[in-house]
């Protein structure tokens, strides 16, 4: 028998699924023969200082470099979740293969200044530009060979930066979105619900409820009007919700739902159209997705990366779906988020080899 799910309670849970797996302490990782330097750099536009780590191969010289851009959530420089530090693993792998790697705490996280809660993807893109500007001052970095590796929202941020930065040598998108934000979330909701065994009727009801809320966000750009319309909408679908927590009043419940969907990041994401930026990218692009990614679906996003770039005249694009990998590029049984912390693997060696081989080939053409 398939499960049923309540429409309204599903809305708020679903909206936060992308960024709710960053908590927890990580296990100590082995060190490798690399040179790592703690770095503080300035985002002059927003007047904040950001903190990161620059890792270099353990030898003298000038090196090609990559900036690692994390996905949604309060991520530190290692994109830490549970016992895992995937960006540390990626950094170690890439430095052993001759790349300098720059990773940093998101604004308002770790040692970085700034307000995380009020920031959106464009703000995070400014932070990446600041990281790029810092690398351009380094004598040990090949200024013409600096690329971006973005995971999830980080892939979206990479497209924003590269669309207006001619000195980006390449982009690697790791489960980065190429379709509109509202569609990303609707596809995500449906895929997760099906994998959890929910019945088709409940899925359809939830899809319509979420789509209605998303359309309000896209239609009304005045903040006061938007909030008024959203409150009215949520009141309509929450009034008879049997899953309302007993310790919350009806008004508190509605307010929690409205607050969730009207967070600055969420509003920006729902209105965001990646194509507006991807079509301006002129550098080589590698787009990777796992076949068991239930958050940014490979079949919906990989073909769009290729279509948009080629239609805009950039034929230097490679797309690849990697078998059995989830949204975090772990080898997975189901792809469900509940597995993320339970899997021993932090980041698939197959995925690391795939992007490293492509980067070496791209820079040596």
Describe the role of every protein-language-model region.
Residues 25-61:
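N-terminal cap/lid segment of alpha/beta-hydrolase-fold proteins
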Residues 89-111:
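Conserved alpha/beta-hydrolase
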Residues 118-139:
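Alpha/beta-hydrolase active-site loop
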Residues 134-199:
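Primarily recognizes the serine-hydrolase "nucleophile elbow" in alpha/beta-hydrolase
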Residues 174-280:
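Accessory cap/linker subdomain of secreted extracellular hydrolases
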Residues 281, 287-289:
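Short beta-strand/loop motif that positions the catalytic acidic residue
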Residues 294-300:
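Conserved alpha/beta-hydrolase "acid-adjacent" motif
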């Amino acid at each position: 028998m398939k499960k049923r799910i309540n429409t309204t309670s599903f809305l708020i849970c679903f909206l936060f699924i992308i960024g709710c797996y960053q908590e927890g302490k990580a296990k100590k990782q082995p060190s490798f023969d690399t040179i790592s330097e703690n770095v503080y750099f300035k985002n002059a536009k927003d007047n904040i200082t950001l903190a990161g780590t620059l890792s270099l191969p353990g030898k003298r010289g000038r090196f090609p470099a990559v900036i690692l851009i994390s996905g949604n959530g309060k991520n530190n420089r290692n994109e830490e979740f549970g016992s895992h530090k995937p960006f540390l693993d990626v950094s170690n792998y890439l430095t052993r293969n001759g790349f300098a790697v720059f990773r940093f705490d998101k604004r308002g996280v770790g040692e970085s200044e700034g307000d995380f809660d009020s920031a959106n993807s464009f703000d995070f893109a400014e932070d990446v530009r600041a990281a790029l500007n810092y690398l351009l001052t380094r004598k040990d970095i090949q200024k013409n060979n600096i690329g971006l590796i973005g995971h999830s929202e980080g892939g979206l941020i990479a497209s924003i930066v590269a669309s207006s930065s001619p000195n980006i040598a390449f982009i690697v998108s790791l489960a980065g979105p190429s379709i509109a934000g509202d569609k990303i979330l609707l596809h995500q909701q449906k895929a997760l619900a099906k994998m959890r065994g929910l019945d088709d009727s409940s899925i359809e009801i939830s899809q319509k409820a979420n789509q209605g809320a998303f359309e309000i966000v896209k239609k009304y750009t005045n903040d006061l009007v938007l909030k008024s319309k959203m409150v009215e909408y949520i009141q309509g679908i929450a009034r008879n919700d049997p899953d309302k927590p007993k310790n919350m009043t009806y008004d508190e419940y509605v307010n929690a739902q409205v607050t969730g969907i009207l967070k600055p990041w969420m509003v920006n994401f729902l209105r965001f159209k990646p194509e507006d930026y991807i079509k301006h990218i002129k550098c080589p692009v590698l787009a990777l997705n796992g076949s068991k990614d239930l958050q940014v679906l490979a079949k919906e996003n990989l073909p769009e990366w290729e279509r948009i770039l080629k239609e805009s005249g950039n034929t230097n694009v490679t797309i690849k779906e990697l078998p059995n990998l989830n949204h975090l590029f772990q080898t997975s049984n189901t792809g469900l988020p509940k597995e993320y912390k339970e899997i021993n693997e932090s980041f698939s060696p197959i995925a690391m080899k795939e992007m490293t081989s492509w980067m070496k080939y791209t820079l040596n053409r």
